[in-house]
């Protein structure tokens, strides 16, 4: 069978031309050879960690109907008797090819992309919840999975590969979705997974240190995030103007053919670039308790107040970002506020367990220096409020932190994590996170380099660390279990073992409870 090649990297018309050259009926595209079924069309890209062209014999054996393969540095073997097409730069073209094959699903969805170091998951989930409350069926794709609020399926990556992403959008469109919100990770943006998707709204939460093992520098990391805001056809850019990158982007986008909604609490009017395409959502009078966040908002000379049953100071920024995204989605301010009042806490994001006659235990995904600083600062402020109202057995309540760092990731942040934990918590236990292929003890030692004081100890076994932290706490204390959030596995030496911080916490609290006590949360 004849093999054809293409060197062009152009628009969707070229994608259609490529599929026509293949001369087979493409019903189901797959880029992951492990998921191939008879009749599928296989896209064999040359990835950074895995070259899928090595899987071509396996794909043929599985009964695929054709193969599109990366042409550069590879030759098709004559014994492979199957329709095929060699394409130079296939990773860049994959999303456009898949979009063409699945009927350009993003054109028929209001597509919202959320990027930033922290807050992507919470913002995407809350946007989907709020839109659902407004009667607009909205799908969501991200760290917690993909699907619809309350019915998510596990995801291997925060941002799926370009082919699977187009398939998911087509499925959600078929299921009646009118909108889709997704987390746009820096890896996904750098690896062209979003090409072929037509975004209506792009949202920036923040930019702090993370993934420097991949991006090498903060400038490269910021550049990856910024790509989303220069997306062809983008209608709205929602920017955090309390962030340096947000201000820079607002200045670069001023006068462009799109609308900007800047948001913030720190007088964003003063930092915003004056331009006809920019509006400001300003939050003020922020108040929070252990149960609720409240603040006032101003937008285009309209005023409203928002109270929401979530906790954590940084969640105020998440709420403001989601409100701005709803406004960009043509939702009236009052309707958006009403919908946001109904959002629910996200699993593993400031998830509260215990309380009552037991210590309060918070499970959170915070795994970057900035996120840990924000969470501990907020909990410290909450604890201070508790101390003002009452004393616990004549002694002040404590803030206890269990934290670790992942293996095979940015080593430079490890001592920073240790420093922040030791400065803001009364007791710290440094433990394992996902050690992956590293020795957990070595990771802990690097975290401990930044920690100081006798209140900082270590425990390699994460379960033992959680037990020790909660057993050492009393009624009125707060215990933060940070780093893994709602993850349901722990990766050790290339294997993933079932593990859930929340289940461990529930078991400890159950063991501690007397016959008359019930675990709360």
Swiss-Prot record:
E.C. no: 6.3.2.13
HAMAP family the UniProt entry points to: MurE (MF_00208)
Family (UniProt): Belongs to the MurCDEF family. MurE subfamily.
Post-translational modification: Carboxylation is probably crucial for Mg(2+) binding and, consequently, for the gamma-phosphate positioning of ATP.
Family matches, as Gene3D superfamilies: Mur ligase, C-terminal domain (3.90.190.20), Mur-like, catalytic domain (3.40.1190.10), MurE/MurF, N-terminal domain (3.40.1390.10)
Binding site for ATP: 116-122
Major location category of this protein: cytoplasm
Source superkingdom: Bacteria
The protein's name in its UniProt record: UDP-N-acetylmuramoyl-L-alanyl-D-glutamate--2,6-diaminopimelate ligase
GO CC list: cytoplasm
Keywords tagged on the record: ATP-binding, Cell cycle, Cell division, Cell shape, Cell wall biogenesis/degradation, Cytoplasm, Ligase, Magnesium, Nucleotide-binding, Peptidoglycan synthesis
NCBIfam families: murE (TIGR01085), PRK00139.1-4 (NF001126)
Role this protein plays: Catalyzes the addition of meso-diaminopimelic acid to the nucleotide precursor UDP-N-acetylmuramoyl-L-alanyl-D-glutamate (UMAG) in the biosynthesis of bacterial cell-wall peptidoglycan.
MF terms in GO: ATP binding; magnesium ion binding; UDP-N-acetylmuramoylalanyl-D-glutamate-2,6-diaminopimelate ligase activity
Enzyme class, first EC level, given as a word: ligase
Subcellular location: Cytoplasm
PANTHER family registered for this protein in UniProt: MUR LIGASE FAMILY MEMBER, UDP-N-ACETYLMURAMOYL-L-ALANYL-D-GLUTAMATE--2,6-DIAMINOPIMELATE LIGASE MURE HOMOLOG, CHLOROPLASTIC
